[in-house]
Amino acid sequence: MAVLEICTYPNPILKKKAVPITEIDDSVLQLVEDMIETMYQAPGIGLAANQVGKPLRLIVYDITPKDQPRNPSVLINPEIISCEGSQSQEEGCLSVPEYYAEVKRHARVTVRGLDSRGEPVEICGEGLLAVVLQHELDHLEGVLMLDRISALKRALYKKRRQKQLKSNDGLVSSPS
């Protein structure tokens, strides 16, 4: 297993729609293992394949409390088949560093996909699980949490992020 590099905003791959996986072969299974390790190392509770530079319809997640054994889940080619209600919850994203915002989402969702053995699965989630599933499936559609907040908050984050990137690349000197 390997820890993969997480793509961060404004990497263009994050805005690309992921393609379905047509065959669950050894390379897909290795990607699943690497994504799980990367998610835990980050640390995070969900990760979509395009966040690690692979535009494939694949997500991993684990919302198990920290004081309990890990229990990662995998969904290949997931799709939301039903949703209802609404909720707002503060979210963060491994691809949107150092930023948290209230995001409005459905309160309950049902998602259908395949597990890592290629078996059909259906997940019904509410609360945090519903948020994680919607957040990760958004990634597969090229949608970031930034796209779900107000234009003002988005503009402020983009400005701050550009400043961070310039500073990190040595293009802007730090004040002495």
Residue ranges and their predicted role:
Residues M1-Q134, H139-S176:
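Active-site rim/adjacent substrate-binding subdomains
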